[in-house]
Amino acid sequence: MVLMQDKGSSQQWPGLGGEGGGTGPLSMLRAALLLISLPWGAQGTASTSLSTAGGHTVPPTGGRYLSIGDGSVMEFEFPEDSEGIIVISSQYPGQANRTAPGPMLRVTSLDTEVLTIKNVSAITWGGGGGFVVSIHSGLAGLAPLHIQLVDAHEAPPTLIEERRDFCIKVSPAEDTPATLSADLAHFSENPILYLLLPLIFVNKCSFGCKVELEVLKGLMQSPQPMLLGLLGQFLVMPLYAFLMAKVFMLPKALALGLIITCSSPGGGGSYLFSLLLGGDVTLAISMTFLSTVAATGFLPLSSAIYSRLLSIHETLHVPISKILGTLLFIAIPIAVGVLIKSKLPKFSQLLLQVVKPFSFVLLLGGLFLAYRMGVFILAGIRLPIVLVGITVPLVGLLVGYCLATCLKLPVAQRRTVSIEVGVQNSLLALAMLQLSLRRLQADYASQAPFIVALSGTSEMLALVIGHFIYSSLFPVP
């Protein structure tokens, strides 16, 4: 028998799922609760009514001592992200013996992403007995159970019976419009975001004033730096993410989130870092724009290839509207800045004076927002994805710099290529995951872009501070 308790339910099950299998009044209370619950126990996939065995002292036909319900159903449905119990009846002789210790039951979920076993406790009722298994469902999927009935009082312990034919099917919960709108409000109604938007626009206009049209024409004639950026962003980084997912044995959802993050184009903050670290700003803006355009083709291609290698079959939706919005958010203020530079040179000089302070304020504000927004998604995060996420920006910086060094590019361009490969547009990855996966899976997979974004911003901020300190101590003559 399978009993369910959804999150937020007011129904309580005292005495079930506790540690140990006591006797006396407590076991009688457990038995009474189980008998009361029989008429509305959960159903299996065949919609068969389940009942608790009466506790025979001889094994049934086929030599099976353990059963769930009447033994006719092997697969049981359960909603995702819920608590509940499984009642396993035991017809092993001596199971209901109240004077001598009975056998022990070991239950293992063979897919812990889908189902986790919290504890197992023995119970007795009437002339029979069994076990209550407390479970917690996670992501939607199918979790086979490995059940072992062991006589732990023998030396060595004796395996009485082993079963692998039961499984729990965790069904996805539907996303309600109210929940979705609440989530959107959580991310979009932050007052700090609205305070930063005017600064972002002015800052991008200032970057437009930094664009050198002659340098831009030269890049069109010799696009090697921009091609290096595409190579690092869409070939090397996704491959690195796939290898790390295999090395650290990341769950499929996390692995997919990491690969999509590493397949994303350069982030809008990359040319901000190029400015603060002495890179080529014109090249940085050009590379960010080009990689964002290329992402409309490379992002779905990379995601499809690695999803197949990971045996993930969800249909992935590329957020074209987000990509177009990113392109416009780059192109319009940059174009305004170029126009200001040509028509209003004095105002252009004023913007150039404030671009670095504005950039630093935006960097701190963006880092603060990222930490605030990631609190809920990053709850319960595990060490492997943290370690991998920390290495992604560092490896990207190293790959980009090595590629640029191989072509003997100027130092400023080497820094820019390095930054473009090392700084991903994690918001695009986040949008793609939220559009493609169900809510619980999407939030789980979204840990990867959040960790990469937080790590990248923190590491780049450390580089900027280190660069300022070094420049102050050892100024270039």
From Swiss-Prot:
Keywords: Membrane, Symport, Transmembrane, Transmembrane helix, Transport. Gene3D superfamilies: 1.20.1530.20. It is a multi-pass membrane protein. It is found in: Membrane. GO terms for biological process: bile acid and bile salt transport; response to retinoic acid. Pfam families: NTCP5_P3_N, SBF. Residues 1-21 are annotated as: Disordered. It comes from the Eukaryota. One of its GO terms (molecular function) is bile acid:sodium symporter activity. Its main location: membrane. InterPro entries: BilAc:Na_symport/Acr3, Bilac:Na_transpt, Na+/solute_symporter_sf. The chain crosses the membrane at residues 225-245, 253-273, 281-301, 320-340, 361-381, 383-403, 417-437, 450-470. One of its GO terms (cellular component) is membrane. Belongs to the bile acid:sodium symporter (BASS) (TC 2.A.28) family. The ubiquitous expression and the conservation of the sequence in distant animal species suggest that the gene codes for a protein with housekeeping functions. This is P3 protein. The gene is SLC10A3.
